[in-house]
Design a protein with these regions (language model features):
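Basic- and hydrophobic-enriched, low-structure N-terminal and domain-boundary segments
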Residues: 1-143, 147-153, 195
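P-loop NTPase motor domains
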Residues: 131-422
Length: 422
């Protein structure tokens, strides 16, 4: 019961108490003239015959005096009902105990908790304890971040989906079978042995033009080496316009099986300028010329015109810049991995799924794909929660980002952390 309702109940009881006070005043009124010696004996007679009331000249005065005394008593009582902390004038801080903290935050059943230490758990339903479930675990190499935090929490097999960043594939090897037996659907983005990986095609998750813009921005950010600064951002900006034109074309004009990065590379090769003096249009120019005849206001055409406004030498340099950004997609293994999609990211908030992202610990060449995966996964889960499930996902999604410093995260990751908890 909160403070307001408690005070309201006390006032109601005080008002009800007026009736017996008035009744008592009427009973003792005939004896008040004789003072206390007459009042006390009369009380015995009053209780023997409580309904024998005689009205007299002192009845009104007696009732008013008793009501005044009663009101003063109630006022003193209500004014002293405060949360006094006696003998704590100099503070009340003390060392907490693991048992007390665990009792305060744990929930039932035990599997529906996040393990903080061996003796302390915190429930996954944040609405009950009103605490943030985001956890930062710091420690040097060999401190036990994976062994004593990641693995025990995965072995809880709670009613939640798991997204695990797994350098070397150690976590998948140790707990994958356990999760599968617990009813999890296991999906793996394996950038160590790509031929064993589930396929992941970022194009599948492009719902609108804004998603395409985010994909291109994230791709350029995640393929930029840390700490590097371009003296002339023109080339990256122009290359991003060309990439936007290609992706917009595929998104709106190509069949689904051709919407992937392998086809982007095919289109880029079709734009190659062999001779700067040759003014003949390239196959890609012809493709966009046909598009202009059908739909001159097509968004892909707008970006292509912006890219194509330079000289042949400039266009060739822009193509080289973009080819350098996308050169990993020339590899057959990566092209095959991104040619289709088997991850179904949106379903992670609807059924128990464990998604492992395996990255080499000694090579960050393909980590940009994990960065794109995280960005699109956040977008898919937010959209599903807000537009399909009324604000929250049926199945909570728990991110375990082991060695996450090795992956380029979205620029607004701190904001995502602050809002995803709800």
């Amino acid at each position: 019961m909160n403070r307001d309702s408690s005070r309201q109940s006390a006032i109601i009881l005080a008002v009800i108490g007026i009736l017996p006070v008035v009744w008592l005043g009427l009973l003792i009124a005939p004896s008040v003239k004789g003072g206390l010696p007459e009042i006390l004996p009369s009380l015995l007679a009053v209780f023997n015959d409580p309904f024998h009331i005689e009205l007299c000249g002192d009845s009104l005065k007696t009732v008013l005096v008793l009501l005044l005394l009663y009101g003063m008593g109630i006022g003193i009582y209500l004014s002293t009902r405060r949360n006094y902390r006696r003998r704590e004038e100099h503070g009340s801080a003390k060392w907490g105990s693991a048992k007390a903290i665990d009792k305060k935050y744990r929930q039932s059943p035990p599997s529906e908790n996040k393990l903080m230490t061996q003796n302390v758990r915190i429930g996954l339903n944040a609405k009950k304890h009103r605490r943030n479930l985001n956890t930062l675990v710091c420690g040097g190499s060999g401190a036990g971040k994976t062994r004593f935090y990641c693995k025990p929490n995965l072995m809880q097999t709670s009613n939640s989906s798991q997204v695990i960043l797994d350098p070397k594939g150690e976590i998948l090897r140790d707990v994958g079978n356990l999760l599968e037996k617990a009813g999890y659907e296991i999906k793996v983005l394996d950038l160590i042995s790509m031929e064993k990986s589930h396929c992941y095609n970022p194009f599948v998750y492009l719902r609108n033009d804004n998603d395409i813009q985010r994909l291109v921005t994230n791709l350029f950010k995640s393929t930029t080496p840390k700490g590097s600064q371009s003296n002339d951002p023109f080339w990256d900006t122009a290359a991003s316009m060309l990439l936007l034109a290609l992706i917009f074309y595929l998104h709106y004009e190509a069949p689904e099986e051709e919407q992937n990065f392998a086809m982007v590379m095919e289109m880029l090769r079709a734009a190659a300028i062999e001779d700067e003096e040759d003014n003949r249009p390239s196959p890609l120019d012809n493709l966009f010329a046909d598009l202009e005849m059908d739909n001159p206001d097509h968004i892909a055409l707008k970006y292509y015109r912006s890219y194509h406004s330079g000289s042949a030498k400039t266009l060739k340099s822009i193509q080289i810049t973009l080819a350098a950004r996308l050169e990993k997609f020339n590899l057959e293994s990566l092209a095959a991995l991104t040619s289709a999609d088997e991850l179904d990211l949106a379903s992670m908030g609807e059924k128990k799924t464990a998604l492992f992202a395996l990255i080499p610990d000694n090579d960050s060449s393909f980590n940009f794909l994990v960065s794109i995966l995280y960005t699109q996964l956040f977008q898919q889960l937010f959209y599903s929660a807000d537009h399909i499930h009324g604000g929250s996902l049926p199945i909570p999604v728990h991110f375990l980002m082991d060695e996450f410093a090795n992956v380029s995260l979205p620029d607004d990751f701190d904001k995502i952390l602050s809002v995803m908890r709800s």
